[in-house]
Amino acid sequence: MSDSPVTLPESIKLTEYSHGAGCGCKISPKVLSTILASQLPVFTDPNLLVGNQSRDDAAVYKLNDDIGIISTTDFFMPIVDDPFTFGRIAATNAISDIYAMGGTPIMAIAILGWPINKLPAEVAQQVVDGGRQACMEAGIMLAGGHSIDAPEPIFGLAVTGQIALTDLKQNDTAKAGDRLYLTKPIGIGILTTAQKQKKLQDEDSHIAVNAMCQLNTIGTTIAKISGVNALTDVTGFGLAGHLLEMCQGAKLTAKLKFDAVPLLPRALDYLALGCVPGGTHRNYDSYGEHLPELSEHQKAILCDPQTSGGLLVAVSAEAEAELIDLLDAHHIAPICIGSLETPTTEVNVVLC
């Protein structure tokens, strides 16, 4: 991972300039549903294959019978203190939505909000350079953008991608019998909250950063497995929230093996110190009625907001071995965390 090219004064800590952190500052699903409930007449475009109706990771527009264009945007406030790393994480997170649809990114433009009377422009320059670094790693140009004077630092991207329509994966197309796999461990919200609470040990500072800077490029290859029936990335709504979207969209119930859910190193240690982000509580308040009765420990893990989290994959039993081989080849632990079944209960997720 590249270091920031310019040394900043130790006194500049970006997380002290924001009230939220990363995807943990997302508006809750319940409130977002109210915001998106338009009062205008319905307008449709037959070439818009994926839009607001399905709560998916990105929009997809059909260009012709073979190719679709993917469009997405994502931005947030600082989740780490280092400007370059913040920009890199924000960009990595935004690009992830393209991979979550099974596509390939082709271009990005930047979104920057900056408190120009509080933080030097040179700090913003490093944030943008961090975004450029992530774009270069994804093989795309940061081709432009827009900036405003804002009370808190905000950075992200609008990303354009393309996809062969035969490879398109959505988050609401899972099937009964599918197995569930996760490509990154959970716990980013816990560890970044430990940093914000000044409880994070120096030797642990790399754990969440390394995870957040890892591009989900494997999504493009996963999508080529015909038995992968649904795909999404796990971000601000937590594992439970994004799993619920998958279940509700396909009218299925998930049997989740809680003890199999992979966790980042030291996540449980910092959870024991009370490092629970506010987004965890907002997530549970928003969708807890669709979950089984959970302990506080289970809530803290399943509802932990992830920033630049991994991919949640629903794969048929017949194609499971092919997915396992692919994950192994990319040095990702192929751990099955559950399965999807025809509903037998009013809740969408049960623990087993």
UniProtKB/Swiss-Prot annotation:
Record: residues binding Mg(2+): D57, D97, D233
SUBUNIT field: Homodimer.
Site features described as Important for catalytic activity, chain residue numbers: K26
EC number of the protein: 2.7.9.3
Residues engaged in binding ATP: K26, S54, R55, D56, D74, D97, G145, H146, S147
Cofactor dependency: Mg(2+)
GO biological process: selenocysteine biosynthetic process
One Pfam family linked to the record: AIRS
Top-rank taxon, per record: Bacteria
Role of this protein: Synthesizes selenophosphate from selenide and ATP.
Enzymatic reactions: hydrogenselenide + ATP + H2O = selenophosphate + AMP + phosphate + 2 H(+)
Keywords in alphabetical order: ATP-binding, Kinase, Magnesium, Metal-binding, Nucleotide-binding, Selenium, Transferase
Name this polypeptide is given: Selenide, water dikinase
GO cellular component, one term: cytoplasm
Keyword Transmembrane helix in annotation: no
